[in-house]
Amino acid sequence: MNLAVQDVVKRPLITEKAERAREASRQYAFEVHRDATKIQVKQAVEKLFNVHVLDVRTAIARGKNKRVGRNVGRRPNWKKAYVTLKEGDTIALFEGT
């Protein structure tokens, strides 16, 4: 599936776990398109943020069951990617500058 670079990376994930990974080992977390491959994620991050990506790990987060009154629904599944950058590269979006 051919995805545009802007469609692959949906948003950054800013959680406590992601912050610890960023500080300890230069890993940044993103929510990505469900059909995106590791190669597409790598190319998109390199092009969007002008950095060098060493490794990409992906995981499918399962949607949770939610209730509103007596109606039960389900949130959709989504994919996240942990991207490891080359020594010295940073993404300013996460640094707050």
From Swiss-Prot:
One GO molecular-function entry: structural constituent of ribosome
GO biological process, one term: translation
The UniProt record lists the keyword S-adenosyl-L-methionine: no
GO cellular component: ribonucleoprotein complex; ribosome
InterPro entries from the UniProt entry: Nucleotide-bd_a/b_plait_sf (IPR012677), Ribosomal_uL23-like (IPR013025), Ribosomal_uL23/eL15/eS24_sf (IPR012678), Ribosomal_uL23_CS (IPR001014)
Keywords: Ribonucleoprotein, Ribosomal protein, RNA-binding, rRNA-binding
SUPFAM superfamilies in alphabetical order: Ribosomal proteins S24e, L23 and L15e
A family per Pfam: Ribosomal_L23
PROSITE patterns per UniProt: RIBOSOMAL_L23 (PS00050)
Similarity comment: Belongs to the universal ribosomal protein uL23 family.
Subunit-structure text: Part of the 50S ribosomal subunit. Contacts protein L29, and trigger factor when it is bound to the ribosome.
Protein's job: One of the early assembly proteins it binds 23S rRNA. One of the proteins that surrounds the polypeptide exit tunnel on the outside of the ribosome. Forms the main docking site for trigger factor binding to the ribosome.
Xref: HAMAP family: Ribosomal_uL23_B
Protein name: Large ribosomal subunit protein uL23
Gene label: rplW
